[in-house]
C-alpha cells in the first residue's frame, strides 16, 4: 500500500493535463490541512482528472463529466511533496450517472456517484462530508476547494489544495451570463459580484460547501475564471438527494429530477 500511495503522489505531480471543461480555485489561499478531509483526487496515468467528495466510507460524489476509464481515487492528501501516513487509494467498483441525462449535453445533470472497491477508514485527514438538509439561500457564504489552477487565464497548479469563500447568487445572474442555462435547471449560481474568486481548470467535481454540507458540485463556468459577471455553475446536490439516497440503498433504476 505504501508503494501505491507513493505512485499516486507521483501521478498527481503530472498536472500538465487537465480537461478543458474542468474548473479550479483562483483568488483563494492554501486550505487548512484539516478542512478538506472529504476532498478526493481523481487521477489516471496522465495525472489529475477531477476532484470529488467523500459522502460516506464507501461513496464519492463528483461530476458526470469527470467520468473516465482506468482512474483511481486518492484520499487524505494535502501536499504533493509531503506524504500523509493516512493517505488511502481506491478504485471505483461501480459508477452511476443519471439514466435520464442528455447524452449530447455535458452540462445536463452533471453528477456522478462512485462506489469504492472497499471502504476507506476515517482518520486525521479523511472524513465524509454531510449531504444537505435544506437548500442554500441566496447570499449564503460557501467554501470552494480544489487542486485546480490558481491563475484565471493560464494553468498554474499548486502543491496544496486552495480554498476560497464565495456567495450563492440569484439564479438570474447565471441565466443572464449563460443564455443556455434553463430557468428550472437543478444548478446553483455562485461567485462574487466583484470577481476574483472562482473555481477553475482542475477543480471539476469538487464541492461547494455551505454550513458544513455539500450543496454543490463544481460543473462549469467562464474562461478566464473569476469574472464577476460570469459566476460558476454548480450541480445542485439538494435537488438530487432522492437519487443519491436511492442509489446508495440499491435502487439503481431511479431517475434524476428533470
Curated annotation (Swiss-Prot):
EC annotation from Swiss-Prot or TrEMBL: 3.4.21.-
Residues in Peptidase S1 domain copies: 25-249
Superkingdom of the organism of origin: Eukaryota
Protein name stated in the entry: Venom plasminogen activator Haly-PA
GO molecular function per UniProt: serine-type endopeptidase activity; toxin activity
Positions annotated as propeptide: 19-24
Organism: Gloydius brevicauda (Korean slamosa snake)
GO cellular component: extracellular region; secretory granule
Hydrolase among keywords: yes
Family recorded in the similarity comment: Belongs to the peptidase S1 family. Snake venom subfamily.
Keyword Glycoprotein carried by entry: yes
GO aspect biological process, one term: proteolysis
Tissue expression per record: Expressed by the venom gland.
Amino acid at each position: 500500500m505504501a508503494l501505491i500511495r507513493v505512485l499516486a503522489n507521483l501521478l498527481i505531480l503530472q498536472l500538465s493535463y487537465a480537461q478543458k471543461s474542468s474548473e479550479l480555485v483562483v483568488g483563494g489561499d492554501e486550505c487548512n490541512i484539516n478542512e478538506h478531509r472529504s476532498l478526493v483526487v481523481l487521477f489516471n496515468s496522465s495525472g489529475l482528472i477531477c476532484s470529488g467528495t467523500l459522502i460516506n466510507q464507501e461513496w464519492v460524489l463528483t461530476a458526470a463529466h469527470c467520468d473516465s476509464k482506468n482512474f483511481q481515487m486518492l484520499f487524505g492528501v494535502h501536499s504533493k511533496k509531503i506524504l500523509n501516513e493516512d493517505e488511502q487509494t481506491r478504485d471505483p467498483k461501480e459508477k452511476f450517472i443519471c439514466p435520464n441525462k442528455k447524452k449530447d449535453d455535458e452540462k445536463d445533470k452533471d453528477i456522478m456517484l462512485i462506489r469504492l472497491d472497499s471502504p476507506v477508514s476515517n482518520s486525521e485527514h479523511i472524513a465524509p462530508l454531510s449531504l444537505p438538509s435544506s437548500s442554500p439561500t441566496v447570499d449564503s457564504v460557501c467554501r470552494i476547494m480544489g487542486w485546480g489552477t490558481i491563475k484565471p487565464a493560464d494553468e498554474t497548479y499548486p502543491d496544496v489544495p486552495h480554498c476560497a469563500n464565495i456567495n450563492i447568487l440569484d439564479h438570474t445572474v447565471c441565466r443572464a451570463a449563460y443564455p443556455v442555462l434553463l430557468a428550472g435547471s437543478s444548478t446553483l449560481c455562485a461567485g462574487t459580484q466583484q470577481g476574483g474568486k472562482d473555481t477553475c481548470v482542475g477543480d471539476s467535481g469538487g464541492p461547494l460547501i455551505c454550513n458544513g454540507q455539500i450543496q454543490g458540485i463544481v460543473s462549469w463556468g467562464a474562461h478566464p475564471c473569476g469574472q464577476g459577471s460570469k459566476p460558476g455553475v454548480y450541480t445542485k446536490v439538494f435537488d438530487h438527494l432522492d437519487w443519491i439516497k436511492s442509489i446508495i440503498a440499491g435502487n439503481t433504476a431511479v431517475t434524476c429530477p428533470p
